[in-house]
């Protein structure tokens, strides 16, 4: 894990050949949906493991079949809330939660409009109560403009959680700057920080639309009435 000196509390995993190999497969335009999903799960599991190293542990004593010995207890891991942004973040969350099995999970449905305003619409939010003892982890594969994440983080600002983290696959510097301007204390963990955003708000070189690549392209809304009329 590498601390990026351009910002406080921003880390990447560019020093991990294993994750860089996984990312290479995700970038490949020929990678199929199932392989893409598995790659996101893999990244989530690895990054979740690394996150546990940043949490507090308490010393404890445990009785083995032979004698007592010292061990550790994860103090923070029992107070984790994972927030998943539909739909691309589901596989990433699946990997994360393997390291935080007692975590509470919240779901947010948010969509970003087109350039130039990139308007954010939050259509659905169902999250557990957050307390000052909790660590909130927001999983979103792509930190592009940062607008969606800012909207989500605002939902928890008044709860004053102990820590707020973002876990993603790729980030653009523009997105990190936007998030940090609103939430300077949020911690950001991504596999890699890419070069920039293009005019359409996509990360470059990026990996395309993570949701479509993980689950397939969705039906157009105009097709839904036709589906309802099918007998």
From Swiss-Prot:
Residues engaged in binding 5-phospho-alpha-D-ribose 1-diphosphate: 87, 112, 140-148, 209
GO biological process: UMP salvage; uracil salvage
Disruption phenotype annotation: Loss of sensitivity to 6-azauracil.
Gene Ontology molecular function, alphabetical: GTP binding; magnesium ion binding; uracil phosphoribosyltransferase activity
EC numbers for this chain: 2.4.2.9
InterPro entries associated with the record: PRibTrfase_dom (IPR000836), PRTase-like (IPR029057), Upp_A (IPR034331), Ura_phspho_trans (IPR005765)
Binding site for uracil: 203, 208-210
Catalytic activity: UMP + diphosphate = 5-phospho-alpha-D-ribose 1-diphosphate + uracil
Chain positions recorded as GTP binding sites: 38-42
Regulation (activators, inhibitors): Allosterically activated by GTP.
Keywords carried by this UniProt record: Allosteric enzyme, Glycosyltransferase, GTP-binding, Magnesium, Nucleotide-binding, Transferase
Record's keyword annotation contains Magnesium: yes
NCBIfam families from the UniProt entry: PRK00129.1, upp
The protein's role, per its UniProt record: Catalyzes the conversion of uracil and 5-phospho-alpha-D-ribose 1-diphosphate (PRPP) to UMP and diphosphate.
Assigned protein family: Belongs to the UPRTase family.
Protein name: Uracil phosphoribosyltransferase
Provenance organism: Methanococcus maripaludis (strain DSM 14266 / JCM 13030 / NBRC 101832 / S2 / LL)
């Amino acid at each position: 894990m590498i601390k990026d000196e351009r910002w406080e509390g921003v880390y990447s995993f560019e020093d991990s050949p294993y994750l860089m190999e996984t990312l290479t497969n995700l970038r490949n335009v020929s990678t199929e949906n199932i392989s893409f999903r598995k790659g996101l799960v893999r990244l989530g599991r690895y990054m979740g493991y690394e996150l546990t190293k940043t949490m507090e542990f308490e010393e404890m004593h445990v009785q083995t079949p032979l004698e007592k010995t010292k061990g550790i207890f994860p103090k923070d891991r029992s107070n984790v809330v994972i927030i998943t942004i539909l739909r691309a973040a589901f596989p990433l969350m699946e990997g994360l939660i393997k390291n935080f099995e007692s975590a509470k999970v919240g779901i947010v449905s948010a969509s970003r409009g087109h350039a130039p305003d990139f308007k954010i619409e939050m259509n659905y939010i169902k999250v557990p109560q957050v307390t000052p003892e909790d660590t909130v982890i927001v999983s979103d594969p792509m930190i592009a403009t940062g607008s969606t994440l800012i909207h989500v983080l605002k939902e928890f600002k008044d709860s004053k959680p102990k820590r707020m983290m973002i876990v993603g696959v790729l980030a653009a510097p523009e997105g990190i700057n936007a998030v940090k301007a609103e939430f300077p204390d949020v911690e950001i963990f991504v596999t890699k920080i890419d070069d920039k955003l293009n005019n359409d708000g996509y990360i470059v070189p990026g990996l395309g639309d993570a949701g479509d690549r993980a689950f397939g392209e969705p039906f157009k809304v105009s097709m839904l009435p036709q589906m309802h009329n099918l007998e």
